Every structure is written in C-alpha cells, then in structure tokens.
Amino acid sequence: MTTLSPKDVVIVDGVRTAMGKSKNGMFRNVRADSMSAELVRALVKRNDFDTNEVEDIIWGCVNQTLEQGMNIGRNIGLLADIPKTAGGQTVNRLCGSSMQALHTAAAQIMTNQGDVFIIGGVEHMGHVGMMHGIDINPEASKHYAKASNMMGLTAEMLGRMNGITREQQDEFGYESHRRAWAATQAGRFDNEIIGIEGHDAEGRLQLCTVDEVIRPDTSMESLAKLRPVFDPANGTVTAATSSALSDGASAMLVMSAQKAKDLGLKPRARIRSMAIAGCDAAIMGYGPVPATQKALKRAGLTVEDMQTIELNEAFAAQGLSVLKALNLLDKRDIINVNGGAIALGHPLGCSGARITVTLLNAMEQMDTEIGLATMCIGLGQGISTVIERV
C-alpha cells in the first residue's frame, strides 16, 4: 500500500442505488433528484462527517431537463440537507459525466480550490428519454458521419473493423449477466448498494437493493435467437449485447488526504491519474483506448500493471474492440469481474462514478492494489481513471 501526501486526492467512500429497468421498473415512481438525495444522505450517514466541510456537490447528468433540469446538482444538495454554504453544479460529458465529476473535484483539490467534495451522477431514462428535447444541427453531417449519433451503428462499425464475431459478442453478453448474478448472490454488491424505496410489479412499496436489469436465466442459446437490432440486414449487435436502458444514481465522497486525516476518516483509495481523449465520432466506442494510454503514461504505469479493470460495456462489440486494442483479451478474468453495463444497465449520468465504485469494491474483494476505470463517450471521447488502494 502507498504512503499518502497531504494533497493526494483520496476516495473515502462510494455508493450507488440498485439499477432499475427504465420500462415499468422499480423506480418508475421515484424522481431522479429524489433518489440522488437519498443516496447523498446515506453517504453522509455512513461516514459521519461534518457536512459544513463540503465545498461543492458535483453531479453528472446527461439530459438536463424536466426533473433532471435546473441544476440538479444544486437541487440534490438542498434536498439532502447539505448546508447551504456548499455549492452545487451539474456536469455533462455524456456517458462519462459522473467520472468527469470525479475528475473536476480531484483537479480542484489538487489546485487548492477546496478539500471535500461529494460527487456522483444520475439518469432516470424512464422519465427523461435519451433523445428528449435533442435537436442536432443539420450541418453536423458535413463534419462527421450522420450515423455517429446512432450509438448502435458505431458499435457495428467497431465490430467489423476489429473482426468481432456475433458469437464472441453473445458470449461477452452472457458472461456479463452470469458474473453480475453470481456477484449478487454472493453479496459482492452489498457494500456499494444503498436501498432506495421503489415499487414492485404490483405497485407495492419495497426497498430496492437488487439490480433489476440482470437476467439470471440468460443462456447462449437464447442469445443466439435474437435478431440484430441496429442493422437488421447485416449486423451482429443485438439488444442482449447492448447496455440496457435503466434508472439509477451513484455517489462518492472525495477529499484531500490531509482533510481525511483531520476528520478521522480512513481513505479507501487515491487517484493516481486521470485522462480524457477524443476519437472519431463514428467509432466513439474506441475512446477508452487513447484515454487509457494517456492515463497510464501520466501514472508511469503500463496496462500490464493493472490488476483489476472496469470497462463500461456500452456494447459487447465495443468492449471487445477496446480490449483487443489494449491487448487485454486474454485478461478477462480481471475485467468486469462482477459483470458490466450489459447486465447492470447504463443510466448515462450515473455510470462513471458507478463503475469507479464497483472497481474499488472489486479491488478490495480481490485484494489488488492498482485498478483502472474507463468508458467510451458518445460523439467520440474516452475517459479513464487509475486508482490505487491505500
């Protein structure tokens, strides 16, 4: 384990909601800002610290309208009874929004612009559709391929470029569900999931503590029967090898190492490096490759040094293409060990902090020291974070 410097950015804790189905799911009657506020309250209670120390609440959210509008980051702080002296902001880097929230807080800590931050993200894709209110510039097709706005087609492109077969994708999707359900049954999500009240299929109030999107009965045989959904004539990407539409929130408590010591809080990890990178919008799923290469270089590490990895599974074709480019195809046993977004869902603004929290818990369960969280971002970006247990 590493020795901390006073200005090291440390992760004290991280939590998330269970992931709910967006269509008639368990959070169908729960607002995005309400579930986020519940999560923040639970994070504060679990760590028992003086919230007057909070500099800012930084929340990732992609479609910032309706219940997710009017600076949801600030609204969450007020709903969660965080002192009004703390600020609140909402950030949008599409799929990487809540990982960007983490990066923003880390940068402020590193530059003496605050010591304690609550970060996280949310997306209620059942209440606020992914394309709600979106008006793409008609001239955009002069600058990048029109299909770049259709995430499934970008996955098809990556799959063809990298020779990813339909069977490989089906196996990847099957394994995501298998691992996620095994993790659920073994209690490996218990430390990260905070129960939020929702409703069962009959409308009865229930405490939601199990990811609703996982399909325990998934089999290779059932996946093989599905038709391609984005390119019906020639495609290989199906609904089962795409991340599910879902509702959920995630949150983390981050601060300087010195402030954690002053408050008597034990850090779980420190941030070693962070990076953003762009790529062609038509192959947006490739973004984790250059972002990870940057982050590793900044940390003075190589991909071989990574002991546990969380890669957001936007699509199986995309995930496998990234693993191929990073020479990680033969290291699947350390990647998404508890399943990924194909099984758990991908609530856009939630996912960045969610995979970082899941990574940290997996590292503790496997007793590894160095880990990587990385994800692709629509319109051609990638974001990566390297963390080290302390």
Curated annotation (Swiss-Prot):
GO molecular function annotation: acetyl-CoA C-acyltransferase activity
Catalytic activity: an acyl-CoA + acetyl-CoA = a 3-oxoacyl-CoA + CoA
Keywords: Acyltransferase, Cytoplasm, Fatty acid metabolism, Lipid degradation, Lipid metabolism, Transferase
Single GO BP term: phenylacetate catabolic process
EC number from the UniProt entry: 2.3.1.16
Pathway: Lipid metabolism; fatty acid beta-oxidation
Catalytic residues of the enzyme: C95 (acyl-thioester intermediate), H346 (proton acceptor), C376 (proton acceptor)
Family recorded in the similarity comment: Belongs to the thiolase-like superfamily. Thiolase family.
Protein task: Catalyzes the final step of fatty acid oxidation in which acetyl-CoA is released and the CoA ester of a fatty acid two carbons shorter is formed.
NCBIfam families the UniProt entry points to: AcCoA-C-Actrans, fadA, PRK08947.1
Protein name: 3-ketoacyl-CoA thiolase
Gene: fadA
